[in-house]
Amino acid sequence: MVENAIALVAHPTSAEIIVNHVKDGLELAKRNRLPTRVRAFIPEHHGTMRVSFLYQKAVESTSNGKVDEAAFRYPGPKPQSKETALLMLADGCEAAVRASRPATPEEVNEIIRKVIADRISWGQLDECPLTMADLEKVRQSFGATLQGMFHPRLIYPDQRDGAIERQRE
């Protein structure tokens, strides 16, 4: 079983599918008459980020390392509100923690710090009113939440065999 069907598609095609889901989402939101403020979340939470994983794979798969970066970039706009910026950060942090499978709270916190720092360095938060104090609160909140969601679980002996013991009434 393939965990991610997009992995079966060529890199530029995969990027097109991923980037176009924003346009498709906006059309769906408009068709369903979602308020403009709600619709803003669809493009803004991706900003003008690059679909980095697929971009890197495409660069590695070419003989000269040249790839049209624009084909791997969301059209934007960058987050314009605290709320859309928070969604961008939450989406990025959750995905990074899920993909990395950290073993310790420190590793979770480091992933969160890196995602936030990356969004800042890439200018994704330049057009929203989040302050550094806000970002520190976000980092702490995400740390507590994601540590609770993705902490390593003990494997109990009866689970190793795939059997789940049912309690009898």
Stretches with model-predicted labels:
Residues 10-13, 90, 100-103, 107-169:
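Long, compositionally biased intrinsically disordered regions
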